[in-house]
């Protein structure tokens, strides 16, 4: 089976159902409200938001939503990620738990500040 090359977030979402789709939509709506000036796009074949540079990526899985704020976005908040599985560039938000929107907001704001500094 050939892997789909997504061209829009809506097309990406069409491949999901149930709780995963609900959580993807919930995160998308939150990010659109949080950073309305950011462009929604597909990057690395997953949804992303960019403003000057990519701020965050996210992806759906069977048991979690992957959130990818790049390596520095993880490192800066590592001490607050102990309730989640995480790696150098990814955080796993379980489908059966509410999103930590306060933490997501702080990470996105940090990424906004970092990308503005890089582009000056």
Annotated model-derived regions:
Residues 1-120:
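Charge-dense, helix-prone N-terminal extensions
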């Amino acid at each position: 089976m050939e892997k789909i090359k997504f061209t829009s977030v809506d097309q990406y979402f069409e491949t999901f159902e149930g709780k995963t789709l609900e959580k993807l939509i919930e995160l998308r709506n939150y990010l659109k409200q949080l950073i309305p000036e950011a462009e929604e796009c597909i990057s690395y074949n997953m949804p992303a938001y960019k403003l000057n540079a990519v701020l965050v990526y996210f992806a759906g899985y069977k048991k979690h939503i992957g959130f990818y704020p790049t390596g520095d976005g993880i490192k800066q908040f590592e001490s607050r990620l102990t309730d989640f599985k995480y790696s150098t560039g990814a955080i796993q938000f379980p489908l059966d738990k509410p999103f930590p929107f306060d933490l997501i907001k702080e990470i996105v704001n940090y990424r906004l500040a970092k990308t503005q500094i890089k582009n000056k």
